[in-house]
Amino acid sequence: MNQNSSVAEATLQLNSGEKPSPGSIPFISSGQHGNISTSATSSTSTSSGSALAVVKSAVKKPTKDRHTKVDGRGRRIRMPAMCAARVFQLTRELGHKSDGETIEWLLQQAEPAIIASTGTGTIPANFSTLNASLRSGGGSTLFSQASKSSSSPLSFHSTGMSLYEDNNGTNGSSVDPSRKLLNSAANAAVFGFHHQMYPPIMSTERNPNTLVKPYREDYFKEPSSAAEPSESSQKASQFQEQELAQGRGTANVVPQPMWAVAPGTTNGGSAFWMLPMSGSGGREQMQQQPGHQMWAFNPGNYPVGTGRVVTAPMGSMMLGGQQLGLGVAEGNMAAAMRGSRGDGLAMTLDQHQHQLQHQEPNQSQASENGGDDKK
């Protein structure tokens, strides 16, 4: 009892902060010290266990999470679980190395719709801070082209046209043949490659099935499948009617003759030939116009000149679209020949014309004299 009372007095003195005297602190045996230490350790263990339980309960995530985190743009984004599942599936199907590459591919496929809704491409404002993936190679170039084209006011139509032609023009069939025909006809009219002749590319023998989809203003909306065959068939029929009408109009045009110079085989020079041009109905035109004949100027028969025939350019000889040798006077041919370097045939024609002019007044005077004699 005395020992217990002394221990209690010592604990009271420690709690109160008073310094006990050395003689007042009783002696504690080893067994009593062991009991006190075990009780203290048990109390600390129970307190630490309760603290760990509180920490674990706070870190625990909720089980009902409708979103899944997907890596992209250098940070973590949140998207619906269905979208994330589809991205994972596309990554496996397309053989991409990461889900971010799949998202980049999806953005490339959605480029026309993005341009239609926002007016710009998928390139972000802070491109310098973006860790763009260059594995595919086509993503960054496509984005840069879209950004460059978006600076112009016609960026929407120009970019859409390029994408429309690229998506449908893998084998070169996206080019409308009507455009080719119009361009070829314009070039032929400007440069004169087909002079008053029907262009061979615009022949009436055309397969109507080769006419592809015509030019559309809206590239992002496909026409209805039911209305498309009827429209294409109507346009094909109209195009054929226009070709037939143009063919009838050009069939009545009289083809122009072609002048040529044969190579000289002897020292006498070469011959000057006029070759009549015949169109598709060559035999009928030859029957209707018997005046088309092949005739030549032999330089050996003309003593005047050096014996060489002048090669005049086609532009100077085709005077007003008229036919030389059929309805053009000899003076016109002589005028055309004067502009060239030689003078053999031109001088001969001038002399011949001069002789004809002198013969006409002589014949008129002779006829007048004959009439006076009869009177």
UniProtKB/Swiss-Prot annotation:
Disulfide bonds: none annotated. InterPro entries: TF_TCP_subgr, Transcription_factor_TCP. PROSITE patterns: TCP. GO terms for molecular function: DNA binding; DNA-binding transcription factor activity. It is found in: Nucleus. Residues 20-51, 222-238, 354-365 have a biased composition (Low complexity). It comes from Arabidopsis thaliana (Mouse-ear cress). It comes from the Eukaryota. The keyword Lipid metabolism does not apply. One of its GO terms (cellular component) is nucleus. Its main location: nucleus. It holds the Pfam family TCP. Keywords: DNA-binding, Nucleus, Transcription, Transcription regulation. This is Transcription factor TCP22.
